[in-house]
A protein has these predicted regions:
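C-terminal substrate-binding/active-site "lid" region of AdoMet-derived donor-dependent transferases
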Residues: 145-203
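Class I SAM-dependent transferase core
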Residues: 26-67
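Conserved class I S-adenosyl-L-methionine
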Residues: 69-78
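S-adenosyl-L-methionine
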Residues: 100-134
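Glycine-rich SAM-binding Motif I of class I
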Residues: 80-84
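Conserved SAM-binding motif I beta-strand of class I
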Residues: 93-98
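Bacterial N-terminal signal peptides that target proteins for export
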Residues: 2-16
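A short SAM/SAH-binding and catalytic strip from SAM-dependent methyltransferases
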Residues: 133-149
Length: 203
């Protein structure tokens, strides 16, 4: 999911859609919609749907350094490709949160066809209402404004050692512990950030 809390040109969004629709077998009929929330976190709709290319999904999961027993939450899970990939490749439980009922239905069908119903769950839920404590890995493709609003919640809810992975956008003054920059197969520059939840300071 690609959230927008700031303005972005329509041409940029359409370019992103055209170059990122590379996952064979995934529904591509959903067109991006720019919701006019203008940074309003109370808006029901935060993000238009733009697929994350499979090669970027792979790099995001690699940067997460997933281990046995991890639980992955994907915010704005769209067509479900991140949660499906996590379950397939690493055998972990993965939960996608998506507010669009059509995408929820489609991604649940993909999960069923992949035989991953025991590992993958798609919840029709607003990401602002998610309780993150069960997760050890959180992935997102949201705009900086949404990232910044989620930051204190993630830092509050997640256990020490949990990883937060963001495609393209950072979290302000919260410095990532790792950053991966690369060119994808369409020669577009990609950046993936990782933050690790630190142990609370000793008193």
């Amino acid at each position: 999911m690609f959230g927008t809390a700031h303005k972005i040109s329509t041409s940029t969004i359409w370019l992103a859609v055209l170059v990122s629709a590379v996952g064979l077998g995934w529904p591509e009929r959903h067109q991006p919609v720019l919701y006019a929330d203008d940074g309003d976190w109370d808006s029901r709709h935060i993000a238009p749907f733009v697929t994350t290319p499979d090669e970027v999904v792979t790099r995001m999961l690699e940067l997460a350094e997933i281990e046995k027993g991890d639980v992955l939450y994907d915010l704005g899970s769209g067509d479900g490709r991140i949660v499906v990939a996590a379950a397939k490749r690493y055998g972990i439980k993965a939960v996608g949160f998506e507010i669009d009922p059509v995408l929820v239905k489609d991604s649940r069908e993909i999960v069923k066809q992949a035989g991953l119903e025991r590992l993958v769950e798609i919840r029709e839920q607003d990401i602002r209402t998610v309780y993150f404590s069960p997760a050890t890995v959180v992935t997102m493709y949201l705009y900086p404004g949404a990232n910044l609003r989620l930051r204190p919640v993630l830092m509050r809810d997640l256990k020490p050692g949990s990883r937060v992975i963001s495609h393209d956008f950072g979290m302000g003054s919260w410095k990532p512990d790792r950053v991966a920059r690369f060119k994808d197969s369409a020669d577009l520059s990609r950046t993936i950030y990782r933050w690790r939840i630190a142990e609370p300071p000793r008193r």
